[in-house]
Amino acid sequence: MGLCSKITATLAAISMSLALCSCDSSSTLPPPNKGDNGSAESDMTEIYDYVRSYQTAYIRSLQLPSGAIKDKGVDNSKITPYFAHFAVLALLTEPTEPNLSVVKNYMSWYFSKLNGSSTEYNSNEIAGSVYDYFAPNETTKGTYDSVDSYAATFLEIAIRFAEVSDGCVNWLKSHKSELSKITSAMVKTIDCAENTLPGENANDGLSIAHYGYPVKYLMDNSEVNMGLKAAIKLKSKGLIDTSSDLEALLAENTGSIRGLYNESKSNYNYAKGNTSSWNKFYPDATAQLYPSLFGVVPASDPKSKLVYDKFNSSFSDWSTGKMYGSFPWTMIAYAAAVMGDKERVDAYVTHIYGLNVKGEQKENWYDAEAGALLLAIDIIRNK
């Protein structure tokens, strides 16, 4: 039986198995048909299709009835909105009705969890922020990893959803107040004249992670740069209200991110005031990929090519599946796709296929890992 035929024959079983299974991501999918030895097919199109179908089904399986998307398949999984956002963005690369249903249900859940200016955990909260939760009962400790990136990546979801159809735009119009609040939350983390932030107030256009952790990270700011672009587009479609000069904030943020480049080290500071070492995988080296990944600096820019080449010199085996930390870090494959590195992306997707075709996931495989891989496939399959 050909690979594409196997996909068609097993997708329904995959989805049902995922929905019923409560084990971790390493064993959520059924084994392949008998006789399949799990070796990679030479036809990358079929390999892409298989992995795409497999990971899409996995992401869908993580959604709770409330619309929340769990980090992974265990019953008591954490629910980290930031991770879910990359999974949702991946579904939007294939805007079928089933995928759009998952996206809408997730967006509705996120809207329902927007914090006000005061919560039981924080009397001075940033309105429009969202806490992390825990399945199965969606309890929270009133904490988040960041405010800036959660908001920015959600705004990117919103604009990509709006670009699907007029019906999607109309649905978003009914949530204009929520989208405006999310935009405000992102803007409130930016060091600019309209804000007074804890720590440094340099009016440099860089965002801090949140008020309890006023660090200006390169990764977060690259995502905020994307979020500002999304907010500008949303505003042009009448989907948000804001008095902030988004274009000016974008220009300042872009200039300051580019200013984090350290000529003496041939890399970007991973945060303002913090130099990076090519010997440290996270956050130093991984951060180098983010300016080009999120369009702050074009992939064709010499600096983008330089840091990408240096990353691969320092961590040369990522495309074979080697993990340099606790997680697979498929954002590397996503960045490689943006850089047009088809050879390495093909190698990594083939590695994942070798697991998926045996009914396995890579260790510590989260929703964001599946999402970033699908985003990489969407870019590179046409190159």
Q: For each of these PLM feature ranges, what is it?
A:
Residues 47-56, 69, 74-82, 139, ...:
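Extended ligand-binding clefts on enzyme/binding-domain cores
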Residues 99, 144-158, 280-298, 329, ...:
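C-terminal capping/lid segments that line or modulate ligand- or cofactor-binding pockets
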Residues 32-135, 180-200, 255-262:
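Low-complexity, Ser/Thr/Pro/Gly-enriched N-terminal "stalk/linker" regions
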Residues 1-11:
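Bacterial N-terminal signal peptides that target proteins for export
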Residues 16-42:
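Bacterial Sec-dependent N-terminal signal peptides
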Residues 88, 155, 162, 225, ...:
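Heptad-repeat amphipathic alpha-helical coiled-coil interaction surface used
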